[in-house]
């Protein structure tokens, strides 16, 4: 009897001790900010820097020593992109990376129906989650300014208010699945010609009334967890590391607590990347489609060049800790969230959602001259022009 009592007492003492030994950052019952600070305190300098840049075409490293997993991103706004090889743009040939092709976001905006936007986000978020993605690189809310912008199909039209009201439910739908939406391209990225070198000139009223409202609503109404910078420049600084747009407006005026991710190839300077609001660097020295330096991740602007500046005492770690806090916050909201659902792929519900959204987005146009339907007796050939005519995306 004494042995039994002793065993019970020992168990009663040991169980609380074991519970106390569980690190705060691994305890999902704790507030995220407590978990972030606990994890931050355990990281080495090298581990912190590794969190801020890519390790492959679409992923960034975690911290295996602490059980912090990698972050996996994927395109795109209206369908989950097939996986590519680790350091190449060729498709990996996986057997589980099909997806439902949802209508373009132009069509979604044309529904004028936030319920359809929520359904869209929920459905595509489930597909991203099933594929184990942490971040969905979309949606886009750049304002239509020219019909020649080849990426207009990724965006939600020319009305800032409509775009903002439609993007917020999409974000909430995606993030219900424990997948971060990544609203892009912040900001003023309204055409594709010379997109890496164009310095956009815009007055403050147009900036705040036309180009920023949808992004602001994405942050303050949608609660988005990540934002992607743009390729172009504003006030002479690239928008993936721009003091005014990222630090002053996004993180300052709007109180954004998430992660700023560079567009692929959008980072150009280590010191500006350190100080001007960029948190995670992806795709440097690549055009985002085919070209790129091979296995160059340790040489990214926020990789060894950043680490060396710290070691040499030329920059401090205040900015680094802020970046890492944001990245850890993202990780705890997504891949380390034990309550996120499993997701699903190619389900009848997703196909039905795509059909419903497509139907509601139909816009009736006047058929002048009876152009449609095409008379095959008169039109023997139809010309399809452009890269997508020959390339499988």
Residue ranges and their predicted role:
Residues 19-393:
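Glycoside hydrolase catalytic-domain context in secreted enzymes
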Residues 1-22:
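Bacterial Sec-dependent N-terminal signal peptides
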């Amino acid at each position: 009897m004494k042995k039994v009592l002793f065993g019970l007492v020992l168990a009663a003492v040991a169980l609380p001790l074991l519970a106390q030994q569980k690190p705060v950052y691994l305890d999902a019952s704790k507030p995220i900010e407590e978990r972030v600070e606990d994890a931050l305190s355990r990281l080495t300098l090298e581990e912190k820097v590794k969190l801020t840049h890519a390790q492959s075409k679409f992923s960034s490293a975690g911290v295996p020593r602490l059980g912090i997993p990698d972050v996996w991103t994927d395109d795109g706004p209206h369908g989950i992109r097939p996986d590519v090889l680790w350091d190449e743009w060729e498709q990996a040939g996986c057997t589980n990376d099909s997806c439902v092709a949802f209508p373009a976001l132009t069509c979604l905006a044309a529904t004028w129906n936030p319920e359809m936007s929520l359904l869209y986000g929920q459905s595509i978020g489930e597909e991203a989650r099933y594929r184990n993605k942490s971040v969905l690189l979309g949606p886009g809310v750049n304002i239509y300014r020219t019909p020649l912008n080849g990426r207009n199909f990724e965006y939600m039209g020319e009305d800032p208010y409509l775009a903002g009201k439609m993007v917020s439910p999409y974000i909430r739908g995606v993030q219900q699945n424990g997948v971060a939406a990544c609203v892009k391209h912040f900001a003023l990225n309204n055409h594709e010609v010379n997109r890496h070198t164009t310095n956009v000139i815009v007055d403050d009223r147009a900036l705040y009334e036309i180009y920023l409202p949808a992004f602001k609503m994405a942050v303050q109404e949608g609660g988005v967890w990540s934002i992607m910078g743009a390729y172009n420049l504003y006030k002479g600084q690239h928008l993936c590391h721009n003091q005014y747009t990222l630090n002053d407006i996004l993180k300052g005026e709007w109180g954004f607590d998430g992660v700023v991710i560079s567009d692929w190839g959008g980072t150009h300077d280590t010191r500006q990347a350190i100080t001007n609001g960029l948190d995670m660097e992806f795709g440097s020295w690549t055009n985002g489609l085919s070209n790129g330096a091979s296995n160059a991740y340790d040489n990214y602007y926020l990789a060894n060049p950043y680490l060396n500046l710290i070691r040499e005492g030329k920059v401090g770690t205040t900015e680094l800790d802020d970046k890492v806090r944001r990245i850890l916050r993202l990780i705890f909201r997504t891949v380390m969230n034990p309550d996120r659902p499993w997701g699903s792929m190619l389900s009848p519900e997703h196909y039905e959602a795509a059909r419903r959204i497509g139907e509601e987005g139909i816009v009736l146009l006047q058929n002048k001259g009876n152009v449609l339907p095409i008379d095959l007796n008169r039109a023997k050939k139809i010309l399809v022009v452009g890269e997508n005519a020959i390339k499988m995306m």
